[in-house]
Amino acid sequence: MAREKFQTLTEPMFYILLCLRRERCGADIAAEVRTLTQERVCIGPGTLYNLLDSFLQAEMIRETKAEGRRRSYLITSKGQDALDEEYRRLLRLAEDYRTCKEGLQ
C-alpha cells in the first residue's frame, strides 16, 4: 500500500516546516536550517524551492508576501499538524531504539 504524500517527512522537509513557524523567505529558511542544525543539514536552492512549491500545493504553507522575486512563507495548521505528527513518530523511533538497546544489555 502506498504511503500518503508527506506522511513521513525527510530531514529537509522537517526543518523547513519548523523554520516556517515564523515568516521567512527562502534564503532565510536555508540560513536558519544551517544555524539550527549547526551546519549538519544544508538545503540547496533546488531542494528548498521544490519543497516550498510542494508544500504550497499541499496547503502546508502559505505565501505571505512577494516583493519582486523574494517571497515569504508561513506554516499553516495543516503543515503544523504534519510537523507535530513527524515529531511524535521520531519520539516513537527513539523509544523503540532505547527499548531494543536495553534489551540487548
Where in the sequence are the language-model features?
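Helical "lid/switch" subdomain of P-loop NTPase nucleotide-binding domains
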Residues: 47-48, 79
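Short, hydrophobic-biased segments on the C-terminal half of alpha helices
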Residues: 49-54
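Beta-hairpin "wing" of winged helix-turn-helix
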Residues: 56-68, 74
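Amphipathic alpha-helical dimerization/coiled-coil segments
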Residues: 84-105
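Basic, amphipathic "hinge/linker" alpha-helix immediately C-terminal to the N-terminal HTH DNA-binding motif
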Residues: 68-86
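N-terminal helix-turn-helix DNA-binding core of bacterial DNA-binding proteins
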Residues: 3-47
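A positively charged, amphipathic N-terminal helix/segment that binds anionic biomolecules
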Residues: 1-2, 73
